[in-house]
Curated annotation (Swiss-Prot):
Keywords assigned: Cell cycle, Cell division, Chaperone, Cytoplasm, Isomerase, Rotamase
Protein name as it appears in the record: Trigger factor
Family matches, as SUPFAM superfamilies: FKBP-like (SSF54534), Triger factor/SurA peptide-binding domain-like (SSF109998), Trigger factor ribosome-binding domain (SSF102735)
Superkingdom of origin: Bacteria
Cell location: Cytoplasm
Length: 437
């Protein structure tokens, strides 16, 4: 193979000019046309018997284009291997104006290469190791939440209070005119739950079933309904029903409802503590991992290939559309989401992917089989039949990609915590459970 010069363009972009001998192009084109001749069905000729000259007239140009495309791909691959180029994404091929060699056809390949990743001094980085504990108070708090989730509402003949579920008819008018979405019959909501605007809810408090009243409501400027944002409406409200909440007792029936077959309340509390502890551990680990990843981003100055960022942004856009579809928004599949809204997140993900790959390779942080099994077992623990979940993962090794990635990240976190300046941060139960994770 002739030597090829790799031209350095901007940032990670490179360019090579590929020379394709016309003799090779013509020979491959002839071969392709003969293959076409054997299967061509042309009026006036038996299948496969049309003259080659006619086949060349009909299909010659497209056959030559196909051959050139195939040879360009093959030649670029050969050059990348010979020059030890770490190509990121797919190359872009362009014609070369100066076709000064009659013996060959020239094509320029423009592409990006992976950056050289150099991990900085991790001992200079600060990371937060987040901790939290789960005791009796946290179990009590969780049990109370579980009770509220099983609230029953019973009809009462009294004035409506916060916490009651009310059923109302209402009609709203702005400047004396009804507006879209401003009226409903037998609408149910819980007072104080924030389902309605504060002035609306305050107007219902103190009413009794059968009563009607007018309530003035000022829509905030930032209200999601643009047609009414910043405007004042008068709602005529009729209260049809008031029901007060009744929480279940923490007894054997309650324990059975939570899956404790014999209704043992102590066992139920232990199960609650185990589940809550697992979730708290997951969340504090996520926050610690986020701190570690931020430290790695700071420790490495890195230019990332635009091609990889664009690919990741497109993947994130498709993921968002699929999530919308899964939520019942069937038309979301056709949404044209601008990739720019995903670029920052995509660039961070690509950067971390490159950094982690380097860190894992340099420091032998690949997970062991036992570590992967532990991650799978942790996944399975929250299901009714853990072994069934474990068997599902191991029935198809491609399903182990997610557990393997988590095991890798865990090893990276432990490695960085052993190198960086670690600041321990204890969070309360509410702080942990209120965090997005």
């Amino acid at each position: 193979m002739m030597s090829v010069t790799v031209e350095i363009l901007e940032n990670l972009e490179r360019k090579v000019v590929l020379s394709l001998p016309w003799s090779e192009i013509n020979a491959e084109t002839d071969k392709k046309l003969k293959q076409t001749q054997r299967r061509a069905k042309i009026d006036g000729f038996r299948p496969g018997k049309a003259p080659l000259k006619m086949i060349a007239q009909m299909y010659g140009a497209s056959a030559q284009n196909d051959v050139i495309n195939e040879l360009v791909q093959r030649r670029f691959y050969d050059v990348a291997v010979a020059q030890e180029l770490k190509v990121a994404g797919y190359p872009r091929f362009e014609g070369v104006e100066e076709q000064d060699d009659k013996e060959s056809f020239k094509v320029a390949a423009i592409f990006e290469v992976f950056p050289e990743v150099v991990i900085g001094d991790l001992s200079a980085q600060e990371v937060e190791k987040v901790t939290a504990s789960v005791g009796d108070a946290e179990v009590d708090q969780t049990v109370e939440i579980l009770r509220k989730q099983r609230t029953r509402f019973n009809h009462v003949d009294r004035e409506a209070r916060n916490g009651d579920r009310v059923i109302i008819d209402f009609e709203g008018k702005i400047d004396g005119e009804p507006f879209a979405g401003g009226a409903s019959k037998n609408y149910a909501f819980v007072l104080g739950a924030g389902q309605m605007l504060p002035e609306f809810e305050a107007g219902v408090v103190g009413m009794k079933a059968g009563e009607s009243k007018d309530v003035t409501v000022n829509f905030p400027e930032e209200y999601h309904g643009k047609d009414v944002a910043g405007k004042t409406a008068v709602f005529t409200i009729t209260l049809n029903n008031v029901s007060e909440p009744t929480l279940p007792e923490v007894d054997a029936d309650f324990a059975k409802a939570l899956g404790i077959a014999d209704g043992d309340v102590a066992k139920m509390r232990e199960e609650v503590k185990k589940n809550v502890s697992r979730e708290v551990e997951r969340r504090v680990n996520e926050q610690t991992k986020e701190s570690v990843m931020n430290a790695l981003i700071k420790a490495v100055e890195l230019k990332v290939p635009v091609a990889l960022v664009n690919e990741e942004a497109a993947r994130l856009a498709n993921e968002m559309k699929q999530n919308f579809v899964n939520q019942g928004m069937t038309d979301a599949a056709n949404l044209d989401l601008p990739l720019d809204m995903f670029k920052e997140q995509a660039e961070r993900r690509v950067s971390l992917g490159l950094i982690l790959a380097k860190l894992v390779d340099e420091n032998k942080l690949e997970p062991t089989e036992e570590q992967i099994k532990a991650v799978v077992a942790n996944f399975a623990e929250s299901y009714e039949d853990p072994q069934e979940v474990i068997d599902w993962y191991y029935a198809d090794t491609s399903r182990l990609q997610a557990p393997t990635s988590l095991a890798v990240e865990s090893n990276v976190v432990d490695f960085v915590l052993g190198k960086a300046k670690v600041n321990k941060k204890a969070l309360s139960f509410d702080e942990v459970m209120g965090a997005q994770a």
